[in-house]
Amino acid sequence: CCQPLVYRNKMTPLRVAVLLAGCWAIPVLISFLPIMQGWNNIGITDLIEKRKFHQNSNSTYCIFMVNKPYAITCSVVAFYIPFLLMVLAYWRIYVTAKEHAHQIQMLQRAGAPAEGRPPSADQHSTHRMRTETKAAK
């Protein structure tokens, strides 16, 4: 699952640039472009016009209404998909940390000293490693 030794080979400057460009391009595609093209008003222009005439004509406020397909698409692309990806990423991190903690615990049990012996320097390092890995649990 985790391969920290090949991270530098996988995360090249080009790949980082593509990921960053995607982080900016996706919001532009789901917000700026459709709003400027009027796609968010398809089917509800009559409602917007009614609201304009009901308000004071000297007012400086902005009426922003969107149709259901646009609202659903934006919600899915901008919230639900990133939310799902973050939950999956954190789940993988959690599972990996639990596996590593279990492996460390098994290694520590395999090297446990017999009763009655004084602890050696190796046992001190094992105890230190145990306390340092509690964060992974």
UniProtKB/Swiss-Prot annotation:
<keyword id="KW-0812">Transmembrane</keyword>
<comment type="function">
    <text>G-protein coupled receptor for 5-hydroxytryptamine (serotonin), a biogenic hormone that functions as a neurotransmitter, a hormone and a mitogen. Ligand binding causes a conformation change that triggers signaling via guanine nucleotide-binding proteins (G proteins) and modulates the activity of downstream effectors. HTR4 is coupled to G(s) G alpha proteins and mediates activation of adenylate cyclase activity.</text>
</comment>
<dbReference type="GO" id="GO:0010008">
    <property type="term" value="C:endosome membrane"/>
</dbReference>
<dbReference type="GO" id="GO:0004993">
    <property type="term" value="F:G protein-coupled serotonin receptor activity"/>
</dbReference>
<keyword id="KW-0297">G-protein coupled receptor</keyword>
<dbReference type="GO" id="GO:0032098">
    <property type="term" value="P:regulation of appetite"/>
</dbReference>
<dbReference type="InterPro" id="IPR017452">
    <property type="entry name" value="GPCR_Rhodpsn_7TM"/>
</dbReference>
<feature type="transmembrane region" description="Helical; Name=5">
    <location>
        <begin position="67"/>
        <end position="90"/>
    </location>
</feature>
<comment type="similarity">
    <text>Belongs to the G-protein coupled receptor 1 family.</text>
</comment>
<feature type="transmembrane region" description="Helical; Name=4">
    <location>
        <begin position="12"/>
        <end position="35"/>
    </location>
</feature>
<feature type="glycosylation site" description="N-linked (GlcNAc...) asparagine">
    <location>
        <position position="58"/>
    </location>
</feature>
<comment type="subunit">
    <text>Interacts (via C-terminus 330-346 AA) with GRK5; this interaction is promoted by 5-HT (serotonin).</text>
</comment>
<keyword id="KW-1133">Transmembrane helix</keyword>
<dbReference type="GO" id="GO:0007268">
    <property type="term" value="P:chemical synaptic transmission"/>
</dbReference>
<feature type="region of interest" description="Disordered">
    <location>
        <begin position="112"/>
        <end position="137"/>
    </location>
</feature>
<dbReference type="InterPro" id="IPR000276">
    <property type="entry name" value="GPCR_Rhodpsn"/>
</dbReference>
<dbReference type="GO" id="GO:0007192">
    <property type="term" value="P:adenylate cyclase-activating serotonin receptor signaling pathway"/>
</dbReference>
<dbReference type="GO" id="GO:0045202">
    <property type="term" value="C:synapse"/>
</dbReference>
<keyword id="KW-0325">Glycoprotein</keyword>
<keyword id="KW-1003">Cell membrane</keyword>
<keyword id="KW-0807">Transducer</keyword>
<keyword id="KW-0967">Endosome</keyword>
<keyword id="KW-0472">Membrane</keyword>
<dbReference type="GO" id="GO:0005886">
    <property type="term" value="C:plasma membrane"/>
</dbReference>
<dbReference type="InterPro" id="IPR001520">
    <property type="entry name" value="5HT4_rcpt"/>
</dbReference>
<protein>
    <recommendedName>
        <fullName>5-hydroxytryptamine receptor 4</fullName>
    </recommendedName>
</protein>
<keyword id="KW-0675">Receptor</keyword>
<dbReference type="Pfam" id="PF00001">
    <property type="entry name" value="7tm_1"/>
</dbReference>
